[in-house]
Amino acid sequence: MEEAIDDHVKLPQKRFYRQRAHSNPIADHSFDYPLLPELSNWNELYPNIGNRQVVFADIGCGYGGFLVTLGETFPDKLAIGMEIRVKVSDYVMDRIKALRQRHKGKYENIACIRTNAMKYLPNYFRKHQLEKLFFLYPDPHFKKAKHKWRIINPTLLSEYAYVLRPGGKIYTVTDVRELHEWMCKHIEEHPCFKRLPDTEAQEDILAPKLLDSSEEGQKVTRMSGEKFMAIFTRL
């Protein structure tokens, strides 16, 4: 039976939500965030799901292309997109709302919040709660003085190890070779993570989707740019 689609509901247009490519993660933005993971009100974000835990987190989810793909690929898993830019996060929230209205019963398992994951990740997730963490096309922060702002660094990796369950995975994708090498070096040096061989990484069901389902990935494809992917297991 064909899926019923409500064509009267229109998807938001990105041109009305444009914002600069990156945001300063150290700036004193104003965010509402739970003091403890137990105080996270997931029912507001997933009103038709019931009492289930978020297990996938897309950090810096951008315009939500990969987040939507996650929802389609794993309909029984809850995924959250975390985005620091206000207009971009507004777009993703409006996009998910429209998708839910257009496709009754679908996309109930994805949501987006505006937050600074570099500061507040442990406020949202319990120890070993997550199965997968995604870092797709993060800000490269090219200047050496700003490398400490990169989303992959030794301090934050310990937080990622805390919220990821043993056997969980970190996924990274970038079109910047130097950043790819930086991320791989720091994750491999952390005692809680081990990189999957490229042959195993290519067999992951998400491998092709990681490269092309996000808006940034599609932009890199249009520009004929290189893409570098790596997957790491939580030991």
UniProtKB/Swiss-Prot annotation:
Keyword tRNA processing annotated: yes
Function summary: Catalyzes the formation of N(7)-methylguanine at position 46 (m7G46) in tRNA.
UniProt keyword list: Methyltransferase, Nucleus, RNA-binding, S-adenosyl-L-methionine, Transferase, tRNA processing, tRNA-binding
Compartments reported by the entry: Nucleus
Keyword Transcription (UniProt): no
A molecular function GO annotation: tRNA (guanine(46)-N7)-methyltransferase activity
Gene Ontology BP terms: RNA (guanine-N7)-methylation; tRNA methylation
Protein name: tRNA (guanine-N(7)-)-methyltransferase
Cellular component GO terms, alphabetical: nucleus; tRNA methyltransferase complex
Reactions catalysed according to its record: guanosine(46) in tRNA + S-adenosyl-L-methionine = N(7)-methylguanosine(46) in tRNA + S-adenosyl-L-homocysteine
